[in-house]
Amino acid sequence: MKISRTNVIIAILIIAFFFVINYLQPLRADDFGRAYTDALDKGFIIYFRGIASNYIHWTGRISAQALIYLFLSKKYIHLSVFMINMINSICFYLFVLYSYKIVRFKTKVELFSKDFLIYFFFFIFLFYQTGFIANVIWKTAAVQYFWGITLLAIFYYISVVKNKQNIWFSLFTGFFIGLYNEIFVGVAIILCLAYFLNQKLSQKQINKNILYFFIACVIGGIILIAAPGNYVRLNTMSAGEHISVLNQLINLVTQIVTKPGDTLIPMLMLLISLVLIFTNKNITKKASFIHGVAIASSIFVLTPVAKSYDLNQRVLLIYDAVFFIIMMQQFYNHSTSFVLKLRLRLNSLSWVFLVLLVMQLELMATIYFEIYKFERYRDTLVTYYQQNEISDPILPMIPEFSQITFIDDITSDENAYNNDAYAKFYGFDKVYGKELG
C-alpha cells in the first residue's frame, strides 16, 4: 500500500517531537534500581534468575520485568537510554496512528486533515492533563506500561478494524499481556467477556483473533496472579492490613472522589463515553448495555491496587487509553445530528486548534528542557563529589513543576528508596536531598 508523502512527514514530526521529550526526561526512581541491577551484563543466567527472584519475592509481571532488565543496563546506560527513547518515540507514533484508525474504523487514513488535527489536539491535551504522557516517558513506565498499551492498540486494529486473522500474533499478544500487568489482564478479560456475550446474544461469529488472545491472556494471567511475589508486594504496600472486600470497594470509590487530580479526567472520559454509547442509535440497546456495563465495571479491577498503594496516574494509564479511544470512537461515529454538527463545527475551527496544539507542544518542550537543564547541573555536582571521593553528598532536589509532570526525585530522607537507588547507581553510600534556594 502506497503511503502518502504528507503522512510520512507527519510521522517523522511526531516521532521527532516525542524523541526530544523522551531525551529530555532524565532517569528517575525505579530507573536507577533497574539499571544498577545490570542483570543482562552479568549473563543470561543472572538475567533469568533476577526475573525468577522477582516472581517469587516481588511481582509476577514476567514479560514487563524481562523487558526492563533487557533494555536498562548501567554498563551500557547511554545505549540503553537511547534505545528506550527511540522505541518509545516510535511507540508514540504507532499509538497515535492506530488509535486514530480504531477511532475512525478505517485501514487507511490521511494525517494531513482537519479530522486528524482535532484528534491529535485532544490526544495531546487530555493525555498531558492526565499525566499519561509524563508517566510514559519515564523509562520504567514506558517499558512496563506504554509498550503494552501500544501492542494492544495494534492488536485491536489488526483483529477488529482490519479483520485480518493471525492466530500466532493473537496468542503472543495474549500471553505477553497476561504476564505483563494484572490491571491490563483484568480490563482485557472483562472487555473480551462482554464481546463474547454480545456476539452470542446477537448470534454473530466470534473473531478468532480475540478468542485466541483471550485464552492466552487468561493462561498468562493465571501465571501472573499466582506469583508469590504479588502477595509479598501487596502485603508490604498495605503494611499487612487486611480489610473486607466491601471496605476495599468503599476505599476505591473514596479515592476516585477525593483524588480529582488523578481521576477527574479519566472519569469524565468514561462518563462521556457512556453517554455517547447509550445515545448512539448505530448500536443496539442490548450491545450498549453489555459494553457500557463492562467498561464501567472495569474500574473495579483497581480495588486491590487502591487498598495496597493508592490510586495514581501510573495505574490509571490503561484506563486513560481505553476511555479516550472509546470516547473518540463514539464521537466520530455517532448517529445524532448534534454530534455530527459539533464535529463539523470543530473542523471549521481547525486553525484555532492548530495554534492551541503548537502552544501545548511548546509548553511541554519548555518544561522538559528546564528539567533537563536542572539534571545537567546536578550531574556536574555528582561528578565533583565522585572525583573528591565524597560518599554521602547533599544534592538539590528538582522543584515541582506541576502535578502532570513526573518528578519522583530523591528526597530529604536518605533511607528512601529513590535515594538508595540513586546512591547505588552513582556509587555513593548515602544521598541527601535538599530544596533549591
List the predicted regions and their residue ranges.
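Short hydrophobic alpha-helices at membrane interfaces in multi-pass membrane enzymes
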Residues: 158-176, 211
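Membrane-interface micro-motifs in multi-pass membrane enzymes
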Residues: 112-159, 261-266, 299-330
